[in-house]
Amino acid sequence: MSDYRVTLEAGWTVKDVESVQDAIGIAVSEAGKRLHPSAKFVDVDVMNMPCPYCGKEINTALVIARTGLVGLLLSMKVFKAENPEHAVHIAKSVIGRALRDVSLSTYSVELIEGDEIAE
């Protein structure tokens, strides 16, 4: 049995926003509130990707017609999983229970070495 850090990606919709920064702030806040009572150990971050023109890192957020779509990364440590697929299944179950109507997709799975567990 091994320990893993599982990161899932989610597309978060925010209504009635004027700017990308507002959409990001509201998305992170709403996700944090929904995760807090049952899964407060989940880290919430804004997803970044390289700009296709300059290669610089940009956030994955978009606002059209006062509706925002923000790419979020939700990561958690999963202890004593049988394999990476089992760790993903556990993470999706825990996070999915808190964020019922949000689609989740696997972003990354990393094996945690013995020293990193004590963080």
From Swiss-Prot:
It comes from the Archaea. This is UPF0212 protein Mlab_0931. InterPro entries: UPF0212. Belongs to the UPF0212 family. HAMAP family: UPF0212. It comes from Methanocorpusculum labreanum (strain ATCC 43576 / DSM 4855 / Z). Pfam families: DUF555 (PF04475). PANTHER family: UPF0212 PROTEIN MJ0068 (PTHR42199), UPF0212 PROTEIN TK1194 (PTHR42199:SF1).
